[in-house]
């Protein structure tokens, strides 16, 4: 009997751990039979809903550790990474609603395009320290990727359809207990959630639950920078 399980991967480009999880799970797609659905969502909406005051960046000793852990994790995944200047302030006070909506708009056009745009945004922010939070900043990434009809895609991000999809993705995650990013649902063939998973470091357990192989960082699969 074919494996009917599905992995839903919820992510926000403001989250560096979403970046690591995104790379890990998309690299494993080449060796897994289990379908993977990528779900851009709005992390700030999750934080507001859970009234979570315990973000690591608000606790100095956790913030210090997290900065080291991010570099350690990026090295493991083979991802060029450095913390942008004024990183803590940006993370706590900047909204990712614009890039997340543009990711949804990109996904409506083509799922591969959405993944390319997500990587481009992460690379701009976490490799070069450049902001990604306004339409003009995201448009620069789209043009660097030679995306067609950039202005049309950016305009599409303001549509009711896009806003509704992003809200639905966020509500779906929250409805199944989400409190952080990245977040995963493993469902059966009928959409019933069998397991929820938090964090980029849980891919070995995800693979085991799916009876799929875990191949480590698979650095040979990383896209060209």
UniProtKB/Swiss-Prot annotation:
Role description: Has roles in respiratory and lipid metabolism.
Keyword Cell membrane in annotation: no
Organism: Caenorhabditis elegans
Protein's name in the database: Glutathione s-transferase kappa 2
Tree of life domain: Eukaryota
Gene that encodes the chain: gstk-2
Entry-linked InterPro entries: DSBA-like_thioredoxin_dom, GST_Kappa/NadH, GSTK, HCCAis_GSTk, Thioredoxin-like_sf
Molecular function terms from GO: glutathione peroxidase activity; glutathione transferase activity
Catalytic EC class: transferase
Keyword Transferase: yes
Entry binding sites for glutathione: 15-17, 52, 200-201
Family indicated by similarity: Belongs to the GST superfamily. Kappa family.
Cellular component annotations (GO), alphabetically ordered: mitochondrion; peroxisome
Reaction(s) this enzyme catalyzes, per UniProt: RX + glutathione = an S-substituted glutathione + a halide anion + H(+)
EC numbers, comma separated: 2.5.1.18
Tissue and organ distribution: Expressed in the pharynx, body wall muscles and epidermis. Weaker expression is seen in the intestine.
UniProt GO BP: glutathione metabolic process
Keyword entries, A-Z: Mitochondrion, Transferase
């Amino acid at each position: 009997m074919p494996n009917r399980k599905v992995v839903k991967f919820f992510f926000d480009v403001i989250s560096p751990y979403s970046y690591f999880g995104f790379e890990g799970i998309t690299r494993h797609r080449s060796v897994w039979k289990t379908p993977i659905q990528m779900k851009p969502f709005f992390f700030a909406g999750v934080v507001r809903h859970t009234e979570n005051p315990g973000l690591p960046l608000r606790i100095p000793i956790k913030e210090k550790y997290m900065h080291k852990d991010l570099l350690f994790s990026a090295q493991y995944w083979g991802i060029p990474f450095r913390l942008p200047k004024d990183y803590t302030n940006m993370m706590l006070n900047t909204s990712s609603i614009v890039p997340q909506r543009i990711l949804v708009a990109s996904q409506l056009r083509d799922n591969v395009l959405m993944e390319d745009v997500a990587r481009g945004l992460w690379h701009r922010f976490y490799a070069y320290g450049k902001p990604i939070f306004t339409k003009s900043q995201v448009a620069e990434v789209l043009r660097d990727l030679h995306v067609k009809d950039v202005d049309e895609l950016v305009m599409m991000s303001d549509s009711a359809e896009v806003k509704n999809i992003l809200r639905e993705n966020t509500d779906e995650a929250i409805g199944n207990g989400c409190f952080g990013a990245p977040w995963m649902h493993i469902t059966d063939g009928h959409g019933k959630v069998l397991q929820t998973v938090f964090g980029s470091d849980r891919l070995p357990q995800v693979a085991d639950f799916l009876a799929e192989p875990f191949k480590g960082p698979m650095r040979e699969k990383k896209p060209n920078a």
